[in-house]
Curated annotation (Swiss-Prot):
Residues 1-12 have a biased composition (Low complexity). This is D-inositol 3-phosphate glycosyltransferase. Residues 1-22, 446-466 are annotated as: Disordered. Belongs to the glycosyltransferase group 1 family. MshA subfamily. Keywords: Glycosyltransferase, Magnesium, Metal-binding, Transferase. It holds the Pfam family Glyco_trans_4_4. One of its GO terms (molecular function) is magnesium ion binding. Homodimer. 1D-myo-inositol 3-phosphate binds at residues 43, 54-59, 112, 145, 169, 189. Its EC number is 2.4.1.250. Catalyzes the transfer of a N-acetyl-glucosamine moiety to 1D-myo-inositol 3-phosphate to produce 1D-myo-inositol 2-acetamido-2-deoxy-glucopyranoside 3-phosphate in the mycothiol biosynthesis pathway. It comes from the Bacteria.
Amino acid sequence: MRPMRAGAGAAGESCKDDGVRPDDVSRLTADAVVRRVALLAVHTSPLAQPGTGDAGGMNVYVLQSALHLAKRGIEVEIFTRATASADPPVVRVAPGVLVRNVVAGPFEGLDKYDLPTQLCAFAAGVLRAEAAHEPGHYDIVHSHYWLSGQVGWLARDRWAVPLVHTAHTLAAVKNAALANGDAPEPPLRTVGEQQVVDEADRLIVNTDDEAKQLISIHRADPARIDVVHPGVDLEVFRPGDRQQARTALGLRPEEKVVAFVGRIQPLKAPDIVLRAVAKLPGVRIIVAGGPSGSGLASPDGLAQLADELGIAERVTFLPPQSRTDLARVFHAVDLVAIPSYSESFGLVAVEAQACGTPVVAAAVGGLPVAVRDGVSGTLVSGHDVDQWAAAIDGLLRSNAGAQGALMSRAAAEHAATFSWENTTDALLASYRRAIGDFTAGRRRKVRDPVAARKPRRWTARRGVGA
């Protein structure tokens, strides 16, 4: 069975012979009103700078989706773990958007893999905040990443509202594509992800490929999956003046420049870009990002590699960039390279293309959706350095003249299909479907006391997909 796309009508065969007809569910979905949403992002704050620590595309997704939901008149509260004593309990980001910094465990010294021990404390903080409101304050809970999902289904049960979950990444997928030096995801995460998949009322994924992974690995119900592409801020990321951007970054007008943007860790494979560029005389590379995850073990490792390759004078290291500064980097370079071993979508690829900059990307995960091979960039199968050097060289050569202008225009046009407005439409469709299904489910329980006593999906299952 194919997963349902957000916006497609269909409510499942389970409504037959239980007192609630499919037409009833469709009507409940159409009538569903989303007024207030609780977003859960335990392990990383939407206010953190992408490219540092665990902050990346998910942070952008959570913040931008909240801002755009608020523009539709929906109140959004984002719950994240406080990581410093100076973090205020509540931050009003914009009209209709609050970030609640929940104290759960020590502020420092914990990484993502320590956080399962603090989920009870985090859940208590979330429930305590909700208790200050009138009953029924939130209409829906949307959890991001498996840690948040663990809190999400507890909140769902307490508040009697549906849970929508976005995994962003899956342990089994990451473990199947480990880079040298990367630590595998622990079994605890695999078990936790299975629990959340079983408990969530709806599952939102970035691509059809991710939906297939959820179905094959975690036996997710295809009828509960909605495909929602992330968006890009087309006001910030849009074509700009290359020479002006190069002047600001101290780059020569005529030189060929490649950029790597992201967290510096084995999973993102920045070393592949350096090794490939080392084979291309005269090509400069900009690396924008900070060490993260396994990369923290050797924070200067990439600079040392540049020295070993003899290209240190051709490499410019920049700290993680603000959105406006990142757009300037994209304007300045000839192409952006994304050689990740695993990538659920690849938001950087879309942001670069929105600026009219073509992309060379690994043909993994969601990148074949984010990049149109041969139109807005080039996809590379595998991580062979010679193949990457050839792909980068080929795109640099084709960028010259009229062909380059055509690809730049095609890149911007492709990226424009990933607007946050489209993403918000799809999110709301998924939310309404979740509310409709959830309401119908509660009516079934009222009409069928035996069904109300049936075990939870998770407790009824045997084994965990891996």
